[in-house]
Amino acid sequence: MAVKDYYKVQGDSVTRIKQFCPRCGPGTFLADHKNRLTCGKCGYTEFKK
């Protein structure tokens, strides 16, 4: 996935689409699966409701 898929540009502002991993910190994004968010680096998993 390219970096452009992690951010959304609207006019002069840039917003982050994906969440950062709370364990690894900024720069490591969580993968968005059907029922969970997962970090590929440390294995952190957060289930969706």
Curated annotation (Swiss-Prot):
Co-factor: note: Binds 1 zinc ion per subunit.
GO CC terms in record: ribonucleoprotein complex; ribosome
InterPro entries: Ribosomal_eS31 (IPR002906), Ribosomal_eS31_arc (IPR022845), Ribosomal_zn-bd (IPR011332)
Listed cofactors: Zn(2+)
Binding positions for Zn(2+) per the UniProt entry: C21, C24, C39, C42
A GO MF term: structural constituent of ribosome
Keyword Ribonucleoprotein appears in the UniProt entry: yes
Zn finger spans (C4-type): 21-42
Key words, A-Z: Metal-binding, Ribonucleoprotein, Ribosomal protein, Zinc, Zinc-finger
UniProt xrefs under Pfam families: Ribosomal_S27
Family in the record: Belongs to the eukaryotic ribosomal protein eS31 family.
Protein name, UniProt field: Small ribosomal subunit protein eS31
Gene designation: rps27ae
